[in-house]
Regions:
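Small-residue-rich hydrophobic transmembrane alpha-helices
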Residues: 49-109, 146-165, 273-331, 335-336, ...
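Helix-terminus/linker motif at the lipid-water interface of multi-pass membrane proteins
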Residues: 28, 32-50, 119-126, 182-189, ...
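Residue-level hotspots within pore-lining transmembrane alpha-helices
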Residues: 29, 33, 62, 66, ...
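Short alpha-helical transmembrane segments in multi-pass integral membrane proteins
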Residues: 1-23, 77-144, 186-242, 299-364, ...
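Short runs within selected transmembrane alpha-helices of multi-pass transporters and secretion channels
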Residues: 70, 74, 138-157, 165-173, ...
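Small-residue hotspots at the loop-to-helix junctions and early N-terminal turns
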Residues: 46-57, 136, 195, 268-283, ...
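Hydrophobic transmembrane alpha-helices of multi-pass small-molecule transporters
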Residues: 61-64, 176-181, 206-210, 282-286, ...
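Transmembrane helical elements of multi-pass membrane transporters/channels
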Residues: 18-37, 138, 149, 172, ...
């Protein structure tokens, strides 16, 4: 099939590594957008970081919703390629893009119109809320770029051409790195400058994707971006992508509640520590997400082609690699949490509280890697419900656990322990679930 790679033959370890590395690098680039903003906005002070952090919860929610079509494309297009059905692969690609555009316009409009009442949830000082509202309204107008780029990335990943999204996203990151200090400090625009820099970078990434997909060597031989939706393809995409998007979106809503609790217990410093710490923790999350996505694509093609032995070997190899990296991240956060946090927010009180977050969260990093790797296995098999059940159940347990620990007098640390403990549970439960059903499906 034109513009695709056959992953059902050849050395498994090398294929997994060459597929996962660009995806992981792309995830790091997407994370670097936030880290770049944090590194510069942090120089404005903890209040500015709190404003950007509050909006960060909502942009995380947006990215979670965008997973509907990223995962939907990776699995539906990937399985169609594995089954040698070129027509279905193209139709799934077109439908994912169309659905992504519709959802992004509706969601972006809601955030723009209701920015202030949404951000009032965090109960921040009025001037911090005002800055956050302006930031959110700018960011919300760029959501179609994010959603469509996610769908484009999923299509390329499904085709085994994960290097292309990496190069395109890298271009956007370089642009963001250049524009951030220029807009924030050079023009004196502060947090507004950070929002505009990110908006322009995301628009550039979208434009390059469109240019590549309209070129002569387009993936899948080219396909329409906007099509009338057909029930057959739409239902399959929602069946695959909706559980993933739901679990990540509900996860974001849980974090919104925990962010408010952090604000109540520790003021804007507590909120800043939680949101900024979560972005730093993305070092682990994005690494595992890269391997998980690569594993999902590999399994989707091989499972559809009946190559079950390759599926099992790929799972074992990926679990070993992510386990090693997760252990290293645990050591970094546990022993050097404050030092890492101070890179982004140099205020003493900020990196003291933030260092506590990273230390406590560090105990769960290996288990986070386990959970996200297992998500990739289930997604590649077309079974997206089990990860959703485990993730939603454990994530919502964070709320009563956090409230209980707060009631016991643990203060803002209660939230950190609730997050860490439930992350351990998710990794263990999802791995055990797969081990129990492995013989039946493989």
């Amino acid at each position: 099939m034109q513009g695709t790679k056959n992953l059902t033959q050849g050395p498994i370890n090398r294929q997994l590594f060459t597929l996962a590395m660009p995806i992981m690098a792309t995830s790091f680039i997407q994370m670097a957008y936030s880290l770049t903003d944090m590194a510069w906005v942090g120089r404005l002070g903890s209040e500015s970081m709190a404003a950007v952090g509050a909006v960060g919860i909502l942009t995380w929610t947006s990215g979670s919703i965008a997973l509907l079509n990223k995962v939907g494309a990776e699995v539906s297009v990937g399985q169609s390629i594995g089954a040698r059905s070129e027509e279905d692969a193209r139709s799934f690609a077109s439908h994912n893009i169309t659905i992504a555009l519709l959802i992004s316009v509706c969601w972006g409009g809601l955030l723009f119109l209701f920015a202030r009442p949404i951000l009032n949830i965090f109960e921040l000082k009025q001037h911090i809320t005002d800055a956050a509202v302006t930031y959110l309204r700018i960011v919300s107008t760029g959501l179609p770029f994010i959603f469509l780029s996610a769908a484009f990335t999923g299509i390329y990943n499904a085709a085994g051409r994960s290097k292309i999204p990496f190069y395109i996203s890298g271009t956007g990151l370089i642009m963001n790195i250049v524009l951030d200090p220029l807009f924030i400090f050079g023009f004196g625009w502060g947090t507004v400058g950070a929002a505009l820099a990110t908006w322009l970078s995301e628009a550039t990434v979208f434009g390059i994707f469109v240019y590549k997909l309209r070129g002569k060597s387009a993936v899948l031989g080219g396909f329409s971006f906007i099509v009338p939706l057909k029930k057959k393809y739409t239902r399959r995409i929602f069946k695959l992508g909706l559980p993933v998007a739901t679990l990540n979106t509900l996860f974001a809503f849980v974090n919104m509640f925990l962010s408010r609790t952090a604000s109540e217990q520790g003021g804007h410093i507590g909120l800043m520590a939680f949101t900024t710490g979560g972005q730093i923790e993305a070092i682990t999350w994005n690494t595992s997400q890269g391997f998980s996505t690569g594993l999902s694509t590999f399994i989707a093609q091989n499972y559809a082609a009946g190559q079950k032995s390759r599926v099992k070997q790929a799972w074992r190899t990926t679990m070993w690699m992510t386990g090693v990296f997760g252990s290293l991240c645990s050591l970094l956060f546990i022993f050097f949490g404050s030092e890492v946090f101070s890179i982004f927010v140099p205020e003493a009180e900020a990196y003291r509280v933030g260092g506590d977050f990273l230390r406590i969260d560090g105990y769960s990093q290996m288990f986070m890697m386990m959970e996200i790797t297992m998500q990739g296995v289930f997604y590649g098999l077309g079974r997206t419900v089990p990860p959703a059940i485990v993730s939603i159940g454990c994530n919502y347990m964070r709320i009563p656990v956090a409230l209980l620990l707060v009631h016991m007098g643990m203060g803002v640390d209660a939230i950190w322990w609730a997050v860490s403990g439930t992350t351990v549970a998710k990794g263990l439960i999802l791995t055990a679930w797969f081990v129990l059903i492995k013989r039946k499906i493989l």
